[in-house]
A protein has these predicted regions:
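Acidic, glycine/proline-rich low-complexity segments that act as flexible tails and inter-domain linkers
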Residues: 2-3, 9-29, 34-35, 42-60, ...
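N-terminal nucleophile
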Residues: 154, 158-161, 176, 230-246, ...
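A generic, well-ordered mixed alpha/beta core segment in the N-terminal half of proteins
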Residues: 77-166
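Secondary-shell segments that build the walls of catalytic and ion/ligand-binding clefts
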Residues: 190-251
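Active-site cofactor/substrate anionic-group-binding motifs, chiefly glycine-
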Residues: 45-100
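Phosphate/diphosphate-binding glycine-rich loops and adjacent basic-rich segments that engage nucleotide
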Residues: 144-212
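Catalytic-core signal marking the mid-to-C-terminal active-site face
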Residues: 2-3, 8, 18, 242, ...
Length: 333
């Protein structure tokens, strides 16, 4: 089943308006969810939308609250998200980081006390659209064991790196620090598929490719094993220092995944060189990667983010594939 982009956008906008968003903010927020689905990231588009509505119903998200700057020094600012709508606060924070980068060459906004930003790649892509290198990350609730542990004390804190291309075909890594995000586990389970590689442990303590089994135990494995575990811990520390807000451990006391810490960094390469030279560097590296001999005959080797361009084009032309039960939930709201 496929749904036209404009239809999906209109339904998201209708629901958000119903739950207290102004028409302008409802449209801006709905675009984020619809664009995520258009890009093929259903886990943080349609599939995540009902959960956000549940948070609105419970009063965990204030649809009228807007983040504000509470401290600044040169190219750095600290913002309080006031537990408002996470994606809009994050978008506005990256907008400001880009403004600072255009002024100083680099800009950083440390956004504390925000709610879930949905897909972190939204903000890396946003920076790249503005001609900037984008670096951003968020912490989470404790949802992953540290390396060597059984219980969850660290987050699968998503990390995003994006580089801009003048033609809009940016290169971007958008990854949770678990082998698979919980959103991806849900997407694979709904599709009735196994994971391509092991992603965590089942109830017997065995490594498994069964997404439902990992969702049940909540014992995911970090990317790179101990390396991903260490990276998660340090990102949490750096983010908490810069925001003066909530660590993974503190978020774990809130009951729901709210009050998160997020860092937005933008770097303007035009301060050093022309966009043509930046494009040439990216194109040369991408071409070299693509020239690799594939491990499996006929398999494409490519840079991260390149599949997204194809998904956007295909889904705009043919409609966005949806899980029927998720779409029915939205229509019933």
């Amino acid at each position: 089943m496929r749904i036209a982009y404009e239809t999906m956008l209109a339904e998201f906008e209708r629901v958000l308006t119903k739950y207290g968003f102004s028409p302008e903010r409802a449209h801006e927020a709905a675009e984020i969810f619809a664009q995520n689905s258009l890009a093929g990231v259903f886990s943080h588009g349609l599939n995540r939308f009902p959960r956000v509505v549940e948070y609105l119903r419970k009063g965990e998200i204030d649809p009228t609250s807007e983040a504000e700057c509470i401290a600044s020094f040169g190219a750095m600012e600290r913002w309080d998200g006031k537990r408002g709508f996470g994606p809009l606060n994050a978008k506005h924070a990256m907008d400001r980081a880009v403004e600072l980068a255009h002024q100083f060459g680099i800009g950083m906004v440390a956004l504390g006390n925000n709610n879930h930003w949905m897909r972190g790649g939204t903000y890396g892509w946003q920076a790249a659209d503005a001609g900037c290198i984008g670096i951003c990350w968020s912490n989470t609730c404790p949802n992953m064991p540290a390396w060597g542990a059984k219980d969850n004390h660290i987050g699968n804190n998503p990390l995003i790196l994006a580089v801009p291309r003048s033609n809009g075909e940016h290169i971007m890594v958008d990854c949770a620090l678990s082998q698979f995000s919980y959103g991806k586990l849900e997407t694979m389970r709904l599709a009735g598929k196994q994971l391509p590689v092991v992603g965590g442990y089942d109830a017997d303590g065995s490594l498994t490719t069964d997404p439902a089994a990992i969702e049940e135990t909540r014992r995911m494995i970090p990317i790179g094993y101990w390396k991903g575990s260490g990276l998660s811990i340090l990102l949490d520390m750096i983010g908490t220092i810069l925001t003066g807000a909530n660590s993974v451990a503190t978020i774990g006391t809130f009951g729901d995944e709210v009050g998160l810490t997020q860092i937005m960094i933008a770097i303007d390469p035009a301060k050093f060189q022309s966009a043509d030279l930046t494009d040439a560097v990216i194109d040369a590296i991408a071409a070299d990667v693509a020239s690799s001999e594939p491990a499996e005959p006929g398999r494409e080797v490519r840079c991260p983010g390149m599949g997204e361009h194809r998904s956007r084009k295909e889904n705009m032309e043919l409609g966005i594939p949806v899980a029927e039960e998720k779409w029915a939930e939205v229509l019933a709201m």
